[in-house]
Each structure stands twice: as C-alpha cells, then as structure tokens.
C-alpha cells in the first residue's frame, strides 16, 4: 500500500498496481544433518521453563506466518504434555495412505502433527528418554509434510533429551526463545539459549510474553512480572528482540477454545503483535546462509 500510494502521488501517474511476490528458500542447518523432505526451514520455539506461554506463542507464530502468505506446519514435540490438538481444535486420528507415512492433520490453513493425535486425551505418556526421542523422530520424519516454507516445532520446556535429539538429529534453521520478564524465567531462558548455542543452532530471537497486564475491568496497566528482562537478555547475547506480548485473558480463552488469537481476532491489536513477531522471524531466517546441499551432485569415490 505504501508503494502504491507513493507512486500514485507522482505527477502524471495513472492507475497504479503493485504485485508483490515472495520466494522462501531453505537455509543452512547444523553440519551433518540432512533436511527433512517437504520442509525448507525448521524453527524451534523453546523456553527454559514451563508456564511462560511457549505453546500459545508457537501456534500463533505458525498461524501468523501463514497469514503472511507462507506454507506452514507445526510439530508438537512436547511428548509428555501435547497441547496443540486442543489449541488448534483438531480431533481424530491422522491417516496413512501408503502404510509407511502419516498425513498431517490440518486446521486454519496449516499442517499439524502431535502425539496427541495418536493417543487418548487422558492417556499419560509413561516413557523413558529413548522412547520419547524415538517418538519425536518418527513424528517428524514419518509425517508427509507437503512443501512447507516453515515447520514450527513446539518444544517441551527445559534442556533434556528431546532438546538434545532435536539439536543433533533434526535440521533446525534457528530457535525462538520465549520467556517472561520474571527473573526466574530469565535464568532458565538463558540456559536454553546457551544450550542451542553449544550445539550449533542459531538463535532467531527472543519473545517476551506476559510483559504487561491490562485489567479487563478498569484498563489499568501493570508490569506484574517485571519489565525489560528479555530486551536486556538480547543485548547481553547480541540476539534480536522479536517483540513483547501482553498478559491478556482473551489469549488464554481463545487458545483453550481451539481458535488461537491470530484466527479468532485477526484484526485485533494482539494478532498484529503476533504478525509483527512472525515478520521479524521470517526476516531473521532469510538473513541466514542458504542451504545448497541439494544443488550439488553426490560424489562417490570407488577403488577399482
């Protein structure tokens, strides 16, 4: 719109039509890890501790990227506590056409996969670490993702087996860290950031959730968890600050009802915040080195 208005204002300009196209390419990942078929870029959404709104941020980030025109999927990597089926309002079981792969579920224009689609809601996952990591690999690689620009991975909190598996065996383009301004959350967020750095996964940026609370009755605004913590962390580690989100009861209500904020209130202020975070995430990914591994032929050396 800005480009159209600027050109139309020039003397002698008639009717102006501006067509904008985009091309999203695959970007470099950890050494020795191959790309997943049908997926160009994998972005992990992680947090150092639970309860900071990571899953809500992940699903709204995925939906916001889709709203910007990208082809997006979301993988629920929280094997012990999957929440994406509820947040996306999806029920039922995924299908398998060939008996080897499974078709992703779909909602609001994005593809989705979760262990929650394969078990009953009340069934606990009493699994040890190796079984959990194997399940994650199968969910990722046995799902027939269809030409995704971005696959958002909703990580479990902490720095355990799943995080290690993801960083060693899954081609991650970058990680988004979600935290609150609270000192305890920031301490754990720093640990998560350092873990990704140690295993060679670049940090796309940090999102500060619950940064401010606005009373739904009187409109009073208050920083109940502190202020400025995530921005300070970004400066300390020289990583981008992607944005802040409010502590708003509607975000929780919309996610619980199976209609996350970006689709429940697309013209609202909070939805625009999510879209701005999505745009910054896309820009940060685009600035990373492209992956050219598929463009080169395989070289085989044989002794004859």
Name what the model sees in each region.
Residues 65-127, 133-141:
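Phosphate-binding loop that captures ATP/GTP phosphates
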Residues 34-40:
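Phosphate-binding P-loop
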Residues 257-272:
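C-terminal boundary of histidine-terminating zinc-finger modules
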Residues 277-280, 290-304:
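A short, charged, Gly/Pro-tolerant segment at domain boundaries
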Residues 1-17:
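Short, non-transmembrane amphipathic alpha-helical segments
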Residues 33-34, 149-150, 156-257:
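Conserved catalytic-core segment of NTP-binding enzymes
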Residues 7, 39, 50, 76, ...:
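Residue-level signature of catalytic and energy-coupling elements of molecular machines
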Residues 42-78, 193:
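Walker A/P-loop phosphate-binding motif and the immediately C-terminal alpha-helix
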């Amino acid at each position: 719109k800005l480009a159209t208005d600027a050109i139309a204002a020039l003397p002698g300009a008639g009717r102006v039509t501006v067509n904008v196209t985009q091309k999203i390419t695959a970007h470099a990942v950890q050494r020795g890890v191959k790309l997943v078929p049908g997926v160009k870029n994998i972005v992990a959404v992680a947090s150092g501790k639970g309860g900071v709104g990571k899953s809500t941020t992940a699903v709204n980030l995925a939906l916001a990227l889709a709203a910007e025109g990208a082809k997006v999927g979301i993988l629920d990597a929280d094997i012990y506590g999957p929440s994406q089926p509820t947040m996306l309002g999806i029920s039922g079981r995924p299908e398998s056409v060939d008996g080897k792969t499974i078709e992703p579920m779909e909602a609001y224009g994005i593809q989705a996969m979760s262990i929650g689609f394969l078990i009953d809601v009340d069934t606990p996952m009493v699994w040890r670490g190796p079984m959990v990591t194997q399940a994650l690999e199968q969910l990722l690689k046995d799902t027939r993702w269809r030409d995704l620009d971005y696959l958002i991975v909703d990580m479990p909190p902490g720095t355990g087996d799943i995080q290690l598996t993801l960083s060693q065996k899954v081609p991650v383009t970058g990680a988004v860290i979600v935290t609150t301004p609270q000192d305890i959350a920031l301490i754990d967020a720093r640990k998560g950031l350092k873990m990704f750095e140690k295993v060679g996964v670049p940090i796309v940026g940090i999102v500060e959730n619950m940064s401010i609370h606005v009373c739904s009755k009187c409109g009073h605004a208050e920083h109940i968890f502190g202020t400025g913590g995530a921005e300070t962390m970004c400066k300390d580690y020289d990583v981008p600050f992607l944005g802040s989100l409010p502590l708003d009861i509607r975000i929780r209500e919309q996610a619980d009802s199976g209609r996350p904020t970006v689709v429940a209130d697309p013209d609202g202020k909070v939805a625009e915040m999510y879209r701005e975070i999505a745009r910054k995430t896309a820009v940060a990914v685009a600035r990373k080195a492209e992956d050219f591994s598929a463009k080169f032929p395989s070289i085989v050396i044989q002794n004859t």
